[in-house]
């Protein structure tokens, strides 16, 4: 038997599929020092959030949490990451805007949004009423169009604002009109 074929079973060998947590030396020392305090491990905690000044959050995902039996003192082990809720809201709004614009482009590529929506400028010009004839419009849609300026208030967009913010339709419509038809700004205004 040669040296190359010799396999010595190491006691620290980890079997495949096992989950083992490797700790740094300072963390091992801290854990050993805390063992003597009689701390009890708290199960079922998935995330710990610590709020700092200027609305900055320190977030520990999948932490190990221990509680001191004599007081309300908790010790948290894990990797803390800085999270800014303002930037998270902006990123979420940008992602939502990108998704909605992509959906609009796909709908336009498939021939329009709804039945009766003109697919081209020529069709729109053919369907346009002449400047001489001014027939009265239905009362419900006319008030929305006149109050909102040049854009059309869509019930689908109002329902989207209601779903995203949880406010009633009147507040959603008011925010949508005050933001001049900008869906993202209306949602951000109500949150």
UniProtKB/Swiss-Prot annotation:
Comp. bias intervals (Low complexity): 127-139
Compartments where found: Cytoplasm; Nucleus
One Pfam family linked to the record: UBA_HYPK
UBA domain: residues covered: 153-191
MF annotations from Gene Ontology: phosphatidic acid binding; phosphatidylinositol-3,5-bisphosphate binding; phosphatidylinositol-3-phosphate binding; phosphatidylinositol-4-phosphate binding; unfolded protein binding
CDD domains: NAC_NACA (cd22054), UBA_NAC_like (cd14278)
Signal peptide: none
Location (main, coarse): cytoplasm
Record key words, sorted: Cytoplasm, Nucleus, Protein transport, Transport
Renumbered residue ranges of the record's region Disordered: 126-149
GO CC list: nascent polypeptide-associated complex; nucleus
Gene3D superfamilies found in the cross-reference section: DNA helicase RuvA subunit, C-terminal domain, Nascent polypeptide-associated complex domain
Superkingdom assignment: Eukaryota
The keyword ATP-binding appears for this protein: no
GO biological process: cotranslational protein targeting to membrane; protein transport
The NAC-A/B domain, residue ranges: 24-89
UniProt record similarity statement: Belongs to the NAC-alpha family.
Function, as annotated: Component of the nascent polypeptide-associated complex (NAC), a dynamic component of the ribosomal exit tunnel, protecting the emerging polypeptides from interaction with other cytoplasmic proteins to ensure appropriate nascent protein targeting. The NAC complex also promotes mitochondrial protein import by enhancing productive ribosome interactions with the outer mitochondrial membrane and blocks the inappropriate interaction of ribosomes translating non-secretory nascent polypeptides with translocation sites in the membrane of the endoplasmic reticulum.
Subunit annotation: Part of the nascent polypeptide-associated complex (NAC), consisting of EGD2 and EGD1. NAC associates with ribosomes via EGD1.
Protein name: Nascent polypeptide-associated complex subunit alpha
């Amino acid at each position: 038997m040669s040296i190359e074929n010799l396999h010595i079973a190491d006691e620290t060998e980890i079997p495949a599929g096992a989950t083992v947590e490797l700790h740094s030396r300072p963390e091992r020392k801290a854990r050993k020092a805390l063992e003597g305090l009689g701390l009890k491990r708290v199960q079922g905690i998935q995330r710990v959030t610590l709020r700092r000044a200027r609305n900055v959050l320190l977030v520990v995902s999948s932490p190990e949490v221990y509680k001191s039996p004599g007081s309300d003192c908790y010790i948290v082990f894990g990797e803390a990451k800085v999270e800014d809720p303002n930037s998270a809201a902006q990123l979420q709004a940008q992602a939502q805007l990108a998704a909605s614009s992509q959906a609009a482009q796909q709908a336009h590529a498939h021939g329009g949004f709804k039945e009766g929506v003109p697919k081209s400028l020529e069709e729109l010009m053919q369907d346009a009423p002449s400047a001489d004839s001014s027939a009265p419009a239905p009362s419900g849609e006319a008030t929305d169009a006149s109050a909102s300026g040049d854009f059309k208030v869509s019930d689908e967009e109002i329902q989207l604002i209601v779903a995203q913010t949880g406010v009633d339709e009147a507040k959603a419509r008011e925010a949508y009109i005050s933001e001049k038809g900008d869906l993202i700004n209306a949602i951000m205004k109500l949150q």
